[in-house]
C-alpha cells in the first residue's frame, strides 16, 4: 500500500484516535482495490461492521451534503485527495 499518494484531512470526528487511524487505513486499502465510490463505501462499511460491530454507514463521493445522527464516539468525516468519506454508526 502506497499511502504517500493519499492526502488525508480529517474535517470532523467524534471517534477515538485508534478508530480514526483504522478508518483512514481501511479507506486507503479500499482505494487501492477499486475506484468505484459505491464499492469503496461497501468495503469500509463491512470492515467496520466486522471490527466494531454493526451497524455502520459509509458515504464516499466528491460532492454530497449530509445531516446524520450517530452514536457517541462513532463518527468521522474526512477528505482523501478529492473524495470525502463520511463514516458513522447508527442503529
UniProtKB/Swiss-Prot annotation:
Family matches, as InterPro entries: DLC_sf, Dynein_light_1/2_CS, Dynein_light_chain_typ-1/2
Keyword entries, A-Z: Cytoplasm, Cytoskeleton, Dynein, Microtubule, Motor protein
GO MF annotation list: dynein intermediate chain binding
Coiled coil (UniProt feature): none
Any one GO biological process: microtubule-based process
CC terms in the record's Gene Ontology section: cytoplasm; cytoplasmic dynein complex; microtubule
Pfam families attached to this UniProt entry: Dynein_light
Highest taxon in the source lineage: Eukaryota
Subcellular location: Cytoplasm, Cytoskeleton
Function: Acts as a non-catalytic accessory component of a dynein complex.
Stated family: Belongs to the dynein light chain family.
Protein name per UniProt: Dynein light chain, cytoplasmic
Biological source species: Dictyostelium discoideum (Social amoeba)
Amino acid at each position: 500500500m502506497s499511502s504517500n499518494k493519499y492526502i488525508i484531512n480529517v474535517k470532523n470526528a467524534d471517534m477515538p484516535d485508534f478508530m480514526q487511524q483504522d478508518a483512514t487505513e481501511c479507506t486507503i486499502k479500499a482505494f487501492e482495490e477499486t475506484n468505484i465510490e459505491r464499492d469503496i463505501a461497501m468495503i469500509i462499511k463491512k470492515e467496520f461492521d466486522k471490527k466494531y460491530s454493526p451497524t455502520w454507514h459509509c458515504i464516499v463521493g466528491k460532492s454530497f451534503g449530509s445531516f446524520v445522527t450517530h452514536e457517541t464516539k462513532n463518527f468521522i468525516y474526512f477528505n482523501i485527495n478529492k473524495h470525502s468519506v463520511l463514516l458513522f454508526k447508527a442503529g
